[in-house]
């Protein structure tokens, strides 16, 4: 298959399927209703019950039907106090759920900076390879234009040049899955300033500069050219 056709197929696939928010599976109403024990306590942010249950022998990393731990549930429901308590009691801050998401990526996709900081402070790693796309929280955040999340992950040592299984870096995703607006520009700018490689091309051989020019993203083009992009 010619490279241009391959590239077009990959782009169509990514635009349809590579949405981290869509790929993630938060608990639905029926699951919340069925939760007991630590999952239920995490969902309602009940740190007191969490501590009591764990001290009475509950498995702190017990899984639900989608392999979510109570900590995953706390992250999805933005229950910061529950997440803090779970990690303090030994919950695995880097556990992956059934869709291969950790709490760092869950918080990043939700643009939940407080939960992200809680996750990182509790031992979550910005270096984890997550999602069905073999990506990172940084790639997901750049794709979605979550600029403060991007800056937080960079400060936490996220890999700047990781390439996911679509052939894209965080820098590329900020362009090809972005809208060229203020927040996506801020993501790209933060990545460039942090030292991301501005010349890693996609699978078709198109560089970030080429991709930005194709889309008419003039601010991104200017940032890339100033950084020596080709």
Predicted regions and their residues:
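Intrinsically disordered, low-complexity regulatory segments in ankyrin-centric signaling systems
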Residues: 23-56, 65-68, 84, 88, ...
């Amino acid at each position: 298959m010619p490279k241009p056709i391959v590239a077009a197929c990959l782009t169509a696939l990514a635009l349809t399927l590579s949405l981290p928010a869509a790929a993630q599976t938060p608990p639905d109403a029926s699951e919340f209703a069925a939760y007991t024990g630590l999952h239920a306590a995490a969902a309602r942010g009940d740190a007191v019950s969490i501590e009591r249950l764990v001290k009475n022998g509950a498995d702190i990393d017990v899984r639900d039907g989608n392999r979510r731990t109570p900590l995953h549930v706390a992250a999805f429901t933005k229950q910061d106090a529950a997440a803090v308590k779970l990690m303090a009691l030994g919950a695995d801050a880097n556990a992956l759920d059934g869709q291969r998401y950790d709490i760092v990526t869950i918080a990043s996709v939700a643009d939940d900076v407080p939960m992200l900081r809680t996750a990182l402070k509790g031992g979550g790693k910005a270096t984890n390879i997550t999602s069905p796309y073999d990506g990172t929280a940084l790639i997901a955040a750049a794709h979605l234009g979550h600029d403060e999340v991007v800056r937080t992950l960079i400060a936490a040592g996220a890999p700047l040049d990781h390439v996911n299984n679509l052939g894209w870096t965080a820098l590329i995703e900020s362009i090809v899955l972005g809208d060229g607006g203020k927040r996506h520009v801020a993501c790209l700018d933060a990545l460039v300033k942090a030292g991301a490689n501005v010349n890693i091309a996609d699978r078709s051989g198109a560089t970030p500069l080429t991709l930005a020019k194709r889309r008419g993203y003039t601010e991104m083009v200017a940032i890339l050219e100033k950084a020596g992009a080709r």
